[in-house]
Amino acid sequence: MMDEKGIKFEDKELHLDGKPKGLIFAVSAPSGTGKTTLCNMLLQEFKDIKSSISFTTRAKRPGEENGISYHFINDSEFDRMIKEDEFIEWANVFGKRYGTAYKSVFNPDRLSDVLLEIDVQGVEKLIEIYGNAKNLNKPNCFENNANRPVTIFIAPPSYEDLCERLKKRGGMDSAELNKRLNTAYEEIKKSVFYDYIITNDDLSGAYVKLKSIIIAERCKNLQKI
């Protein structure tokens, strides 16, 4: 995909003045693991990290706001964005679609770090863009790409714990619960190919680990300037 200056979005790891662009942190997790809570905590503390707000066709949940939690759009608008190649990645999750727009991440003037809160399918597609890898079964696919996305997986402490969390969330029958648990099982198997894995058995402890990853990656990036 080309921009008005004829530069591929996929090639924009460097700003036009030659300085490294901001880092991309891609955080994913099974449903009910606390990913959104941890990401919100991070954004509250690190004001210089920009959140990439995803587009979705699902309905708003209580407390969510359009343009802040997600861009809530209908299926027709989502189809249009796919047709016009406006997404870096999009995925169908439990019958609802989620997508990350190119303009949210590959703005040529962006120097700030960006936080992507996306599912495992989304990370797979992001990896394909940056590393030409077909899927997460191909680790180290960004080995020669200094400015690749930093992938972080939030894991539940156990299968049983995740089951209890999803039951407490409510709003789903036993068939939906089993579907989410089976999906979580497959997602957790792919977590070994992420850069980092954080087990969320204690929210404050998990947040300290997430924050430490951000700080460490920023220091690593400074060495390349």
Give names to the regions the model predicted.
Residues S28-P30:
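P-loop (Walker A) phosphate-binding loop of NTP-binding proteins
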Residues T33:
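ATP-binding Walker
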Residues L14-G22:
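Phosphate-binding P-loop
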Residues M2-K8, K12, E164-M172, K179, ...:
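NTP-dependent small-molecule kinase module
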Residues D113-V120, N135-K168:
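Conserved phosphate-donor/acceptor-positioning beta-strand/loop module used by diverse small-molecule
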Residues T56-V114, D119-G122:
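ATP-dependent small-molecule kinase phosphotransfer cores
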Residues Q44-S52:
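Post-Walker A helix-loop "phosphate-sensing" segment adjacent to the P-loop in P-loop NTPases
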Residues T36:
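Walker A/P-loop
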